[in-house]
Amino acid sequence: MCVIMGDFTDLDRQIEQLRRCELIKENEVKALCAKAREILVEESNVQSVDSPVTVCGDIHGQFYDLKELFRVGGEVPETNYLFMGDFVDRGFYSVETFLLLLALKVRYPDRITLIRGNHESRQITQVYGFFDECHRKYGSATVWRYCTEIFDYLSLSAIVDGKIFCVHGGLSPSIQTLDQIRTIDRKQEVPHDGPMCDLLWSDPEDTTGWGVSPRGAGYLFGSDVVAQFNAANDISMICRAHQLVMEGYKWHFNDTVLTVWSAPNYCYRCGNVAAILELDEHLQKEFIIFEAAPQETRGLPSKKPVADYFL
């Protein structure tokens, strides 16, 4: 099956199917990923995004909460979206979640930007659920392989109107400028260390300088590091995801770093609310807070114990 640009009949049908949380066929996944690859390969490591845009944090396979996000924030293409990674793992519907976002990307490439999170990785998804889910729903690892190949093509960061730097995790001691990010060869599995790893794994910390991350990857970075980076790159703030915040969003370092978290009642048990950030054409900020959607419980697997390790 081949989706030809200009004829979106099949793709529109697949989007409708995925919106109902119904799987598409394996050969359709293959074709969708091939098309997505053509689009993503053209994007920069620091993808330029124009305002107005709505910025979203981690989703983690919580499909019905993604639908709630679209309900409160507007559907694609009416609303322009930027998702900061971690589409998969932990939730029950990583397959449907990622494929819906990918199908929307192929259908409306200029209205949705997807950047890579630390869970968009072969190694991590084999531990935290996506691999097992693909196997359970498709009977083999083939769909997982198609999707993880696409992970390698996802952009590492984005910049809104040249002013707001968006990245999944945070900063790296190896990176002082956006141009240094632009030179990274991103088309690979997330390395265990180095600048690409740091962008996806690091966290802000109320300290100065750099610290050892308890996650075992990336770094903790302090307010002075942020001040230096923002000044050197003439940006007003860093927007990132990666950390659960109970209120859905959290400011750090005098409003120079913002954490946005978009998975309500994370892991179906944390009791947190979620947030998305609306930026208007003047980069004025408005937060939309939302709660978990009523869950569709049919067909849920019995919860497999996974390591309690919060990413």
Swiss-Prot record:
Molecular function via GO: metal ion binding; protein serine/threonine phosphatase activity
PROSITE patterns tied to this protein: SER_THR_PHOSPHATASE (PS00125)
Subcellular location: Cytoplasm; Cytoplasm, Cytoskeleton, Microtubule organizing center, Centrosome
Residue numbers binding Mn(2+) 1: D58, H60, D86
Annotated binding of Mn(2+) 2, by residue: D86, N118, H168, H242
Keywords assigned: Cytoplasm, Cytoskeleton, Hydrolase, Manganese, Metal-binding, Methylation, Protein phosphatase
GO biological process: angiogenesis; brain development; central nervous system projection neuron axonogenesis; determination of ventral identity; dorsal/ventral pattern formation; double-strand break repair via homologous recombination
UniProt modified residues of type Leucine methyl ester: L311
Main subcellular location of this protein, as a coarse class: cytoplasm
The keyword Repressor is assigned to this record: no
Superkingdom: Eukaryota
CDD domains: MPP_PP2A_PP4_PP6
Reactions listed under catalytic activity: O-phospho-L-seryl-[protein] + H2O = L-seryl-[protein] + phosphate; O-phospho-L-threonyl-[protein] + H2O = L-threonyl-[protein] + phosphate
EC number, UniProt record: 3.1.3.16
Any one GO CC term of the record: nucleus
Catalytic residue list: H119 (proton donor)
Claim: Hydrolase is one of the keywords in the record: yes
Cofactor note as given: Binds 2 manganese ions per subunit.
Entry coiled-coil feature ranges: none
Known role: Protein phosphatase that regulates many processes such as microtubule organization at centrosomes.
Family to which this protein belongs: Belongs to the PPP phosphatase family. PP-4 (PP-X) subfamily.
PANTHER family reported in the protein's UniProt record: SERINE/THREONINE-PROTEIN PHOSPHATASE PP2A-RELATED (PTHR45619)
Subunit structure and binding partners: Serine/threonine-protein phosphatase 4 (PP4) occurs in different assemblies of the catalytic and one or more regulatory subunits.
Name of the protein in question: Serine/threonine-protein phosphatase 4 catalytic subunit A
